[in-house]
Amino acid sequence: MQKSCNEKEGKPKGSEAKREDEQPCGALEGQRLEGNFRQRLLQSLEEFKEDIDYRHFKGEEMTGEEEEMERCLEEIRSLRKKFRALHSNRTHSRDHPF
């Protein structure tokens, strides 16, 4: 069972009258969480705006990027083929050492 703020500090429950301006134990924590939430929300909003800006490229710019991406993918494919060939040569040489 959870104790009230006053009990945690070692004071009896009814020894002090609560003032209206006092905040309950979880109020500060709630404000911190709300602040963190707002910060994350603002950050995600900024990231979203940046993403939207990138969607408005001209067709020429996108074509250039697509070609570059395709070249990179082709290079990756060729490197994978080379690695497979090297790996298969290495395993075959282990099978028959002489």
UniProtKB/Swiss-Prot annotation:
Major subcellular site: nucleus
Compartments, record wording: Nucleus
Pfam family, one: BEX
GO biological-process terms attached to the record: negative regulation of DNA-templated transcription; negative regulation of NF-kappaB transcription factor activity
Keyword entries, A-Z: Coiled coil, Nucleus, Repressor, Transcription, Transcription regulation
Renumbered residue ranges of the record's region Disordered: 1-33
GO-annotated cellular components: nucleoplasm; nucleus
Sections of the chain in a coiled coil: 59-89
Keyword Magnesium: no
Disulphide bond pairs: none
Keyword Transcription regulation: yes
Bias kind Basic and acidic residues: ranges: 1-22
Function: Plays a role in the negative regulation of NF-kappa-B signaling at the basal level by modulating transcriptional activity of NF-kappa-B on its target gene promoters. Associates with cyclin D1 promoter containing Myc E-box sequence and transcriptionally represses cyclin D1 expression. Regulates telomerase reverse transcriptase expression and telomerase activity in both ALT (alternative lengthening of telomeres)and telomerase-positive cell lines.
Family to which this protein belongs: Belongs to the TFS-II family. TFA subfamily.
Protein name (record): Transcription elongation factor A protein-like 7
Name of the encoding gene: Tceal7
